[in-house]
């Protein structure tokens, strides 16, 4: 009898739909989707009653509030902007490289209109979508030709399939990396149709290891830049120039997967040496592959640059169409590459600006936020301290950049609860938790985001106390 009474307390769908709180949603969205969300709430309540989790009759307003929250949650975009206070510049989970304003504007112009993606406006005949970026890539890298696909893993698969299908590809055992998401070089190679031939050991590989492994079925010598981990101690690896020399001696092409792939030597900004795309190609490598959304600072893309004879063959490969880039990637990449020709490109490309920004400038932003938080007299212990940022994106492993951070120790709620509340905002604010304090690293927080950070912290620190 008690169960029946509880079930009878569940309002009807039509009654909920008449509630004033839902009228704006009904005016804006299709009635069917709002009705479906209301039914989902009622079904959940019914299940809770039958299972014994709910033992009190339902109040009508309570159900309306639940329905409203369900609808709001549904229409809140799952993919939304995030203020990055983690200090990780190329945060994979946050989309890696933020685009430069010029690239964003290029996206805006082409995404909402038509464009000459595959049309030569001079001749009026069909063109190639790759023409929009190939000239810039060749000019910047010194390559004879270039091709862009949807990501670097695709670039590697395409290059291997085109250059060494059914043939052996010799690679050092110490370079058989996992590139993220459980995707590993051996598995990628298998899908390409190439045959993996490992040489050397995890910590030591010599040029003679490659030489001894070469036979009549060798199709390619492959080097993989281990940008996402570092082996130290008793190690030895083969220099790019030595592998190129062996390749020329034996008439075997050499390919190098650079992964993060920088066009800029960042050693003068406190980062360790990493070979640039230009240096690898200048050393004589036939084909190099790298990402567009890491150190380059552009959209997600896999870039293939190198000798014309190899790249031209890839452009005709059947796989190329399956992994080609769309008009938005073309526009964003073209705009990003154009910035590299400007004198002040380091300050215009967000990733490079963040990586090369002096700690003194970061400190000024940190002081600005710190003063705002102190003036707000929030119920928390707040301090400004030196900190360490990371490059991220599988680049420069074990390398930290000097930065400045705000540390927050809430008085009336746990640091985990604060972090969760900030994550659920729109835009979300992400930081990191260290020693029971919420940390905001100002290296990755933009000047225009400081006031927003202050408002969110005030909302959740003061709001929780009230």
From Swiss-Prot:
Pfam families: Se-cys_synth_N, SelA. GO terms for cellular component: cytoplasm. It catalyses: L-seryl-tRNA(Sec) + selenophosphate + H(+) = L-selenocysteinyl-tRNA(Sec) + phosphate. The modification N6-(pyridoxal phosphate)lysine is found at residue 294. Its EC number is 2.9.1.1. The keyword Transferase applies. One of its GO terms (biological process) is conversion of seryl-tRNAsec to selenocys-tRNAsec. This is L-seryl-tRNA(Sec) selenium transferase. It comes from Carboxydothermus hydrogenoformans (strain ATCC BAA-161 / DSM 6008 / Z-2901). The gene is selA.
């Amino acid at each position: 009898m008690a169960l029946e009474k509880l079930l009878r307390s569940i309002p009807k769908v039509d009654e909920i739909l008449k509630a004033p709180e839902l009228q704006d949603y009904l005016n804006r969205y299709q009635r069917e989707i709002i009705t479906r969300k209301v039914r989902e709430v009622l079904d959940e309540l019914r299940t809770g009653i039958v299972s014994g989790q709910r033992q009190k009759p339902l109040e009508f307003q309570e159900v309306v509030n639940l329905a409203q929250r369900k609808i709001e949650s549904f229409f809140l975009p799952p993919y939304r902007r995030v203020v990055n206070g983690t200090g990780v510049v190329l945060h994979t989970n946050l989309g890696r490289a933020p685009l430069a304003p010029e690239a964003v504007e290029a996206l805006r112009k082409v995404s909402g209109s038509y464009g000459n993606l595959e049309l030569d406006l001079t001749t009026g005949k069909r063109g190639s979508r790759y023409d929009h970026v190939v000239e810039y890539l060749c000019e910047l890298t010194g390559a004879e030709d270039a091709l862009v696909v949807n990501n670097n893993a695709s670039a590697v698969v395409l290059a291997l399939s085109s250059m060494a299908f059914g043939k052996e590809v010799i690679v050092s055992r110490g370079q058989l990396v996992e590139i993220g998401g459980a995707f590993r070089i051996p598995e990628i190679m298998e899908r390409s149709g190439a045959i993996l031939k490992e040489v050397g050991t995890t910590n030591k590989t010599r040029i003679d290891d490659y030489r001894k492994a070469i036979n009549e079925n060798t199709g390619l010598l492959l080097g993989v830049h281990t940008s996402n981990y570092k082996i130290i101690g008793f190690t030895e690896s083969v220099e790019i120039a030595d592998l190129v020399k062996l390749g020329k001696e034996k008439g075997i092409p050499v390919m190098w997967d650079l992964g993060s792939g920088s066009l800029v030597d960042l050693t003068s900004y406190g980062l360790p040496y990493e070979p640039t795309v230009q240096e690898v190609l200048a050393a004589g490598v036939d084909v190099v592959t790298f990402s567009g959304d890491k150190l380059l600072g552009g959209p997600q893309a896999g870039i293939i640059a190198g000798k014309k004879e190899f790249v031209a063959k890839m452009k005709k490969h059947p796989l190329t169409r399956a992994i080609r880039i769309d008009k938005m990637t073309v526009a964003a990449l073209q705009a990003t590459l154009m910035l590299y020709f400007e004198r002040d490109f380091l300050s215009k490309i967000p990733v490079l600006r963040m990586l090369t920004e002096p700690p003194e400038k970061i400190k000024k932003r940190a002081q600005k936020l710190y003063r705002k938080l102190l003036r707000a007299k929030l119920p928390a212990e707040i301090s400004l301290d030196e900190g360490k940022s990371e490059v991220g994106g599988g680049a420069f492993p074990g390398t930290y950049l000097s930065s400045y951070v705000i540390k927050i120790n809430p008085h009336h709620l746990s640091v985990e609860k604060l972090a969760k509340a900030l994550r659920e905002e729109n835009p979300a604010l992400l930081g990191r938790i260290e020693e029971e304090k919420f940390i905001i690293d100002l290296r990755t927080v933009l000047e225009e985001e400081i006031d927003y950070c202050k408002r969110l912290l005030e909302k959740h620190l003061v709001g929780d106390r009230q």
